[in-house]
Structure formats: C-alpha cells, structure tokens
Amino acid sequence: MRMRIRLLALLCLCSVGLARATPKTSNLPFTDKQFEMVVACIKHFEGWHNMKDYVGYGHQLQKGERYSAKTMTKAQGDLLLRLDLMRNLYLFRKYGKDALLLSVLAYNVGPYAILGTSKRPKSRLLRKIECGDRNIYNDYISFCRWHGRQVPSIKFRRQVEYDLFFVK
C-alpha cells in the first residue's frame, strides 16, 4: 500500500515537472515534433525492458528506485523515458542544436561516456562539436560497441539517429 502511494505521488510530481519541462519551440533549438520523434525512436530501438537493472524503455534503475517491469505500465515507462531524456537535454543544453543528438546518444551510452569524468576524457565527438567541427558522422557512429565488439544493430541505430537528428 505504501509503495502504491509513493508511486502515485512520484507520478503526480513527475507529471507536473514534465508539463513544465516539455520543450517549447521558442526557447530550445528543436521543435516539439522533433522531441516526439526522439521519444518514438528510443522506444523503437530500446523496446520494453524487464531485466534486473533496466525497466520500461531502457530506464536504468538508480539507487533507491524500486520499479518493477512486471507491474510498470506503458504510460509509466513513457514518463520515465521523457524524464531521462529531459535530464540529458539539461546536461547538453549548452551545445545548442546538437543537444538533441547528444541526448539521444546519452540515453543509450550514458552521459559520461560523452562528457567524460575525472577518470575518462571527453569523447572525441564532443571535442569536435566544441571546436565547431561539423564532420562528426564517424565519431557518432563509433558509439556502436558492446564489450569491445562492434554490433551491427547498434551501428544501424546510430546511423538512423544521426540521419534523423543531426542539424547541419
């Protein structure tokens, strides 16, 4: 019972936050339609997760979160996807027209694979964007490895994402 109340409270808070956080075309370098395309693209490639550490459309469970893939609805999964995507957009907001592309990539590989950490340097992709170099196709596509191996389906996903969301 307590868990249901917490989940309901979280959903109410998230929906209020999402309503305020929904991209407005006037102050962001992309449209609502593009944002919805990103959501649809991620849903298509991620599918519905029911693994131990991931739920919904690829939401990685954080410490203290207790979502269950068995009881989660599609609407709850959609909400988590949008919140995660908005969090990524906030992290990459200073990259302007590239924020959407970087956010889509970060949803799959994690933001710090791109931004770097104290132990990991910034990605070559991000360094090129910061220098104004628009020739980033190969660097974007290079994020197609899993356990050191290139995965054709991930490479295809990167190509689709790049074609849909790269702004010249």
Please place each PLM-identified region on the residue numbering.
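Long, amphipathic alpha-helical surface segments
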Residues: 20-51, 59-66, 72-94, 112-168
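Short, Lys/Arg-rich N-terminal segment immediately upstream of the first membrane anchor
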Residues: 1-2, 30
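Hydrophobic h-region of N-terminal signal peptides that target proteins for export
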Residues: 11-20
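Short N-proximal segments of mature Sec-exported proteins
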Residues: 99-113
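Sec-dependent signal peptide recognition
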Residues: 4-10
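Post-cleavage N-terminal segment of exported redox proteins
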Residues: 3-4, 18
